[in-house]
Amino acid sequence: MVGLESKYGDYLFTSHAHSDHTKKLKTRKLISSNFTSEIIYNKQPDPPPKGITLYNAGHIIGSKQITINTEQGRIGYTGDLRLSPRFGIKGAEIIDCDYLIIESTYARSTHPPYEEVYESFRKCLKNKGIKIIAAYEVGKAQEITKILNEEGITPIVTEKINRLNQYDNLDQVVAGSDESKDMLKGEYVAILPPKKVNREFATNLSVALNEKVLTIGVTAQPWALWKYDYAFAISDHSDQRELIEYVEQVNPEMILTTHGDDIYFANLLR
């Protein structure tokens, strides 16, 4: 039996490396991508049983969907997914299944076109001053580092972000290193976890360094508009339109919604 991000089952399927989707492995065998298994469990995944297939989920690096063949039909589970591609990240594959379990994090929302958001973000980077970008260390930080590198910017990052960025061969400087200390003498761009970044933090840093400091959020969550100086809806989830498009392309016999606005999304699909 396979536990879909559950404490039950002989096998544990972990779709990606975000903490809200990970469970204790204990003595179970693990089904996941190499990236997820190494980051979360410090081991290689086990070979999946016959009848199990993994697919790209388009959410973050190493994110996977799964299908499981049973006597009653094929079960598909998306985990978190993003159908459309974005900077350096392929979109989710359309899986073939009879019973679909799909996330619904942004089932009520509509994201602006990624190209427009990306272009606005690029323009923001040209502003004068120190720029502190709030991004989750797993997934979002890798995406933002890719964009910064494309713009010729090498960001200062935490040790964890630096370690994870190695999987994508990205360019960054670790905070606290001699190189970062030299960068701190002028304008620079840094990526920090969201819990460490807010306007009060920026004000204190600005006073200490006598430099203009801008905080930048890169999330589709509405609270980012008041927490940061700038906020860009760079989302690693599908919005309502994409979720519906995904369901239509899969065309399963039965749909189960989970994570987020699951009841709302279920009623929308009826």
Language model features by range: what are they?
Residues 1-12, 19-132, 139, 150:
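His/Asp/Glu-rich metal-coordinating catalytic cores
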Residues 13, 77, 99-101, 132-134, ...:
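Structural motif
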Residues 22, 63, 85-86, 140-145, ...:
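Short, well-ordered alpha-helical microsegments
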Residues 60-68, 81, 85-86, 99-105, ...:
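Active-site-proximal loop/helix segment associated with metal-binding centers of metalloenzymes
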Residues 150, 172, 176-270:
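C-terminal regulatory/interaction regions
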